[in-house]
Amino acid sequence: MIKDTFLKTNWLNISHHITLLVFGFYFSFYSLAKELVSSTAQPVNYYTHLLNVSFVGYIISLIGLSYYLSRQVSRQLFLKTSFIVISYLIVSYWVQITQHLNDKRFDIWSLTKNQFYQFQALPSLLIILVMATLIKILVAYFAIEKDRFGLLGYQGNTFSVALILAVVPISDIHLLKLISSRFSELVRAGNSQIALLKISGLLIVLLVIFATIIYVVLNALKHLKSNKPSFSVAATTSLFLALVFNYTFQYGVKGDEALLGYYVFPGATLFQIVAITLVALLAYVITNRYWPTTFFLLILGTIISVVNDLKESMRSEPLLVTDFVWLQELGLVTSFVKKSVIVEMVVGLAICIVVAWYLHGRVLAGKLFMSPVKRASAVLGLVIVSCSMLIPFSYEKEGKILSGLPIISALNNDNDINWLGFSTNARYKSLAYVWTRQVTKKIMEKPTNYSQETIASIAQKYQKLAEDINKDRKNNIADQTVIYLLSESLSDPDRVSNVTVSHDVLPNIKAIKNSTTAGLMQSDSYGGGTANMEFQTLTSLPFYNFSSSVSVLYSEVFPKMAKPHTISEFYQGKNRIAMHPASANNFNRKTVYSNLGFSKFLALSGSKDKFKNIENVGLLTSDKT
């Protein structure tokens, strides 16, 4: 089988495509060399020499690309070229707009200032097209055989055109500036040869990636024209949805200033676009249908975008993976949203279902994959790529993952802002990055010198200390009543910086504190977070001991504790009572208090025991209740 495949392979055609790739590389390298010369503030002898050498390769590549393209000159070629150039300008600018969501000075209509008109590659592309047309005319005029002059075995196809058109995105001024900055850093460090090798390899990889994307898009156009569902159509739609939802996700957490000199950290946008594309494409491959999957993704992406925006505005925190447990409390969730918004979403959902049903049997009807083997291979490939993005985060040490990995190493390692919380990380590193850390990061970092012996030694130390303290202690906590009253709205304004009050607003509480044992509790947020305060109160385990990727201790930490020890262990089950004026299922409370042996848990809903004679203050249950 392998031998037959080897013999049937058109190696001549493959060699021609490799030659096309080489021509594309020299074309791109010349564009990079020009950017290096124009942008560097260092002595330019090295860069000038590089520019002169690359110019020779550029001229050869112009001739070579024209020669190959002459076999495919047609009206369709000019239309495809125009479509790719215009589409790339729009996509590139859309990405730029997304990357400046945190820049309140960015004006999307200042097209010239924002370098929307990126025509760097256009003159060269026009030269290639004109030369290719002239070559075709001359070949026809002189009746020259098509396989003469080195084109023997060459079979021009869509990928050939895609390889040539890949020089358009490679010439993007923003991409060239990014590459040249990395190149200049290595050159200044005296590693010019290493820099040359790395940048050359990067250009080749980028050419192949861009050529593949263009090939898929051009194939999708062909299949759309023939009303044929295909993997290319699904992949193109996935990329389009990723570009749209990348914007809407980030819009929900946008700010108005730079952080560490960035409005969005390098790699954040690309990471999120790739992540969304992979998820969407996997959905298409699994369902093997176009329209139902498309509308499902549209609805899901819209809901995530809206909820993310609402949660950020209400709680200063983005939508997190752990928030999806609230799906079991849809009634409570919808109570936070205006009825008009819910009605609009329901109507939109109904319209989507009707349209999907109508289109399903008429436009792009049928399966995306007819072959189960190809479909399974696609699923496997997508899973492998997805895992390659997730696995490195699972093996991080001291907040750092393996260096040298494309996109994710720089995104995770270069700027450590985990301590700034979920909102800041989502704003500058993307919502997808925050979600990735949530599903991959360990709940607690392993401390230095951690071992069973070390823990036993610490336990022995404090056991002895407890015995010494309890020698003269007359009272036993088990014989006393302990009440924790946690109020989200209670705090002392005297402790808030830059705030002055005309008189003491908590005189009674301060008087009680002065006459008994008293202290302060650390709150990790301004209002809210009561469930986390409950966990810390019961277990004496502070929130800051856990990973920065942890959001809700009851949902993420408690279920993984083999034997959670709490202060409630000093009391019999019948004397353990909890009250919370909301749903018992919120933040996993019902399960937690059940596992801790509480005999009663009073809640507004979801529990056996409920509050009576409820009085509200505004929308919330009063203290009197």
Model-predicted segments: where are they?
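Solvent-exposed soluble domains appended to multi-pass membrane proteins
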Residues: 467-473, 487, 492-625
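Surface-exposed loop/turn and secondary-structure junction residues enriched for glycine/proline
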Residues: 145-147, 152-154, 322-324, 336, ...
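Envelope-exposed proteins and targeting segments
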Residues: 478-481, 533
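Extended, compositionally biased non-globular segments that define protein topology
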Residues: 1-322
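Beta1/beta-strand and adjacent pyrophosphate-binding region of the FAD-binding site
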Residues: 483-485
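N-terminal secretory/membrane-targeting segments
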Residues: 84-91, 130, 160-161, 297-301, ...
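Ligand-binding pockets and gating/stacking loops
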Residues: 113-124, 189-207, 233, 327-332, ...
